[in-house]
Curated annotation (Swiss-Prot):
One cellular component term from this protein's GO annotations in UniProt: host cell cytoplasm
Chain's gene name: P/V/I
Entry-linked InterPro entries: Paramyx_V_Zn-bd (IPR024279)
Start and end residues of each stretch annotated as Disordered: 54-94, 150-172
Source species: Mumps virus (strain Enders) (MuV)
Annotated binding of Zn(2+) 1, by residue: 170, 189, 214, 217
Pfam families assigned to the protein according to its UniProt record, in alphabetical order: zf-Paramyx-P (PF13008)
Main localization of the protein described in the UniProt heading: virion
Family: Belongs to the paramyxoviruses V protein family.
Keywords assigned by UniProt, alphabetized: Host cytoplasm, Host-virus interaction, Inhibition of host innate immune response by virus, Inhibition of host interferon signaling pathway by virus, Inhibition of host MDA5 by virus, Inhibition of host RLR pathway by virus, Inhibition of host STAT1 by virus, Inhibition of host STAT2 by virus, Interferon antiviral system evasion, Metal-binding, Viral immunoevasion, Virion, Zinc
Function: Plays an essential role in the inhibition of host immune response. Prevents the establishment of cellular antiviral state by blocking interferon-alpha/beta (IFN-alpha/beta) production and signaling pathway. Interacts with host IFIH1/MDA5 and DHX58/LGP2 to inhibit the transduction pathway involved in the activation of IFN-beta promoter, thus protecting the virus against cell antiviral state. Blocks the type I and II interferon signaling pathways by interacting with host STAT1, STAT2 and STAT3, and mediating their ubiquitination and subsequent proteasomal degradation.
GO biological process entries: symbiont-mediated suppression of host cytoplasmic pattern recognition receptor signaling pathway via inhibition of MDA-5 activity; symbiont-mediated suppression of host JAK-STAT cascade via inhibition of STAT1 activity; symbiont-mediated suppression of host JAK-STAT cascade via inhibition of STAT2 activity; symbiont-mediated suppression of host type I interferon-mediated signaling pathway
Subcellular localization: Virion; Host cytoplasm
Sites where the protein binds Zn(2+) 2: 193, 205, 207, 210
The protein's name in its UniProt record: Non-structural protein V
Length: 224
């Protein structure tokens, strides 16, 4: 059996293929109802069905809104607020670098060790890892070997921040931002009756027992 195709046969095959392509390209598809299962060649169903459904999703009508528009993804999805974050209220704190809101809080910087200079394509990953390690170690309080003395230590526990305090209190929160090789930290206080959210937020007291300021945040507002 001859396995070679003659030149005139090649021209006929190309012409036939072009005619088939032009036939389908010139025939407009009005909707999914114009495509029956028996008329679709196996293997091309997702392409043929996806095209009209894409048009129906982008230009929905009253009869198509609902279950049909939810069946197949159109590639454009709206942002959905997680249920755990919805309704928590409070004022969202912007990027720690610009967190000068006037509501209290302090911005500090944890500088990168100049002797450690990672290079290569993973430089930013290594710097971020080092910054996180320094932040974790910064807020770990070492065991005391002597009698505690009266001192102000940001982030330490206080009488008004104990969860079992019936008078309410504050808890210290931190928001971290990696900016040009430095870790920027914004820290502030929230009432202990307020929810703990993933996004940095200022909350107001809901129980009526939390003080306006505590010994942790009294210096966040500057000198009296």
């Amino acid at each position: 059996m001859d396995q070679f195709i003659k030149q005139d046969e090649t021209g006929d095959l190309i012409e036939t293929g072009m005619n088939v392509a032009n036939h389908f390209l010139s025939a407009p598809i009005q909707g999914t109802n114009s495509l029956s299962k028996a008329s679709i060649i196996p293997g091309v169903a997702p392409v043929l069905i996806g095209n009209p459904e894409q048009k129906n999703i982008q230009h929905p009508t009253a009869s198509h809104q609902g279950s049909k528009s939810k069946g197949r993804g159109s590639g454009v999805r709206s942002i959905i607020v997680p249920p755990s974050e919805a309704g928590n209220g409070g004022t969202q704190i912007p990027e720690p670098l610009f967190a000068q809101t006037g509501q209290g809080g302090i911005v500090t910087t944890v500088y990168q060790d100049p002797t450690i200079q990672p290079t290569g394509s993973y430089r930013s990953v290594e710097l971020t890892k080092i910054g996180k390690e320094r932040m974790i170690n910064r807020f770990v309080e070492k065991p005391r070997i002597s009698t505690p003395v009266t001192e102000f230590k940001r982030g330490a526990g206080s009488g008004c921040s104990r969860p079992d305090n019936p008078r309410g209190g504050h808890r210290r929160e931190w928001s971290l931002s990696w900016v040009q090789g430095e870790v920027r930290v914004f820290e502030w206080c929230n009432p202990i009756c307020s929810p703990i959210t993933a996004a940095a937020r200022f909350h107001s007291c809901k129980c009526g027992n939390c003080p306006a300021k505590c010994d942790q945040c009294e210096r966040d507002y500057g000198p009296p």
